Amino acid sequence: SDLIAAEYGVSRIPVREALAQLQSEGLLEIAHYRGARVSRPRAGEIDELFDLRQLVEGDLLARALGRHDQRSLRELTRLQDALEDADDRLGWISGDIAFHEALYGPAERPRSLALFRQLRAPIDRFSAQALGPGARKQGWADEHRRLIATVAAGDAAAARTILEQHLQATRTIALAACSGDGES
């Protein structure tokens, strides 16, 4: 932390606080007197994160379902159109986060949305590595469009099923990226 503070001309305290925050979010492993490194979740951690995502996102979707209106549905469609136009991995991931936040936003559950973001962060690193052009992009786009349609129709059971399939496909990508990094 001393080197980072010196390089950026800031005191050590905010650097330590930032590193502690990254560590608490599971993004950084700190070995005292040895430094820090970016953490790599293991397959079991990925599975646990997705199990939790199923619970949190399923609940958010169910609570948001009856609260969407024409404006929010148009916004979901606009976000999905922009997402399909994204041509880089990081742009695609930020667009996907925006889509899901708009999908769940009408639930008006800020703590659940914060938990959704926290559960997603370690997964997105590995999805970003595995997501090449067209790798799964069309499948995700189709699932998003089907989610919009089922939300517009108020079909809770179909929306839940599509979300579960969507998260399972993403789990598969994240696990493949995790095992590709030599983690198990």
Residue ranges, per PLM feature:
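A generic membrane alpha-helix/interface feature
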Residues: L19, Q118, S127, Q138, ...
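Mobile beta-alpha loop/short-helix "lid" or hinge segments that flank ligand
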Residues: S24, L28-E29, L119-A121, R136-Q138
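Short amphipathic alpha-helical interaction/hinge segments
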Residues: D124-G134, R171-C178
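Conserved amphipathic alpha-helical segments that form helical-bundle/coiled-coil interaction surfaces
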Residues: R67-Q129, D142-T150, A158-Q168
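Residues at secondary-structure transition points
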Residues: D2, I13, Y33, R40-D47, ...
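Short linear motifs at protein or domain termini
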Residues: S1-G66, L175-S184
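C-terminal effector-binding regulatory domain of bacterial HTH transcription factors
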Residues: A156-S184
